[in-house]
């Protein structure tokens, strides 16, 4: 684990601790005033704990952990249950170590500090486990310097996206070097690798794709490939049953059309840029609204949602999706690992 990764893990812990203290403060204040009004200790304590837990949850979701919108309800339930369990164990601990005679606030502070780290790791492993993932895009051509890219990001990305672009999609595309995928797998042997297949002639790539199937975990096609080449896609799936498939769509794609693909794809990739095939483009703000519409789909938990292109420090936090893909914003920064960890959340 590199130094930047350690720094960010410590940062998560520091903010979690801070928000936990703020949550306890909210709990104490609410309990005090409810007790003044109703003179019911149980109700005041219960209501205070609920308010404190909700505040701590909101603070962590807003500032510390970024998870997809459709998972927020699950995260809230888990966080609340863990918070209530924490209070129950703290009550037992108070009796066990003989601090029942202390005031409520001091009891809570002492017992919370004793079991705090345990519940931090429980929340990280369960409540906030499904955070937004960050992938690095690498083009499958001879222009990409893999050694340079690897030295910049090391193992910090959650996954690698390999962009295979031909001239049927982008007229200035460089010649594809399919062997690049072998080199990428060698450098990131444990990472999830997805192929972003940007071509309007899937048939021309059928043999090459079959050859690299053992190296990849997902292939993302364009909508024309899905509509016109389902037989090829089914053949690929039959050769590698674990292969996941996705479709990439413009942010302007009709909502009903997007729904159609959610029923046959493992992943929907929304392009955050206007023209596919090259990096360094500005982000399309319409992407944010498209993501919000997709988040309302009834089957939202049945597929992954990814945004690819234009991701930078001004917009990543507006996109509560399963996956984000970036290239130039990360690789052109002074500290690429720090930028990756920032996008992974922050």
Regions found by a protein language model. Give the residues of each.
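Glycine-rich phosphate-binding active-site loops on the catalytic face of alpha/beta enzymes
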Residues: 219, 223-225, 270-279, 321-341
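Histidine/lysine/aspartate-rich catalytic loop segments that bind and position anionic ligands
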Residues: 248-290
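Alpha-helix-loop-beta-strand connector modules within alpha/beta enzyme cores
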Residues: 174-195, 239, 246, 286-305, ...
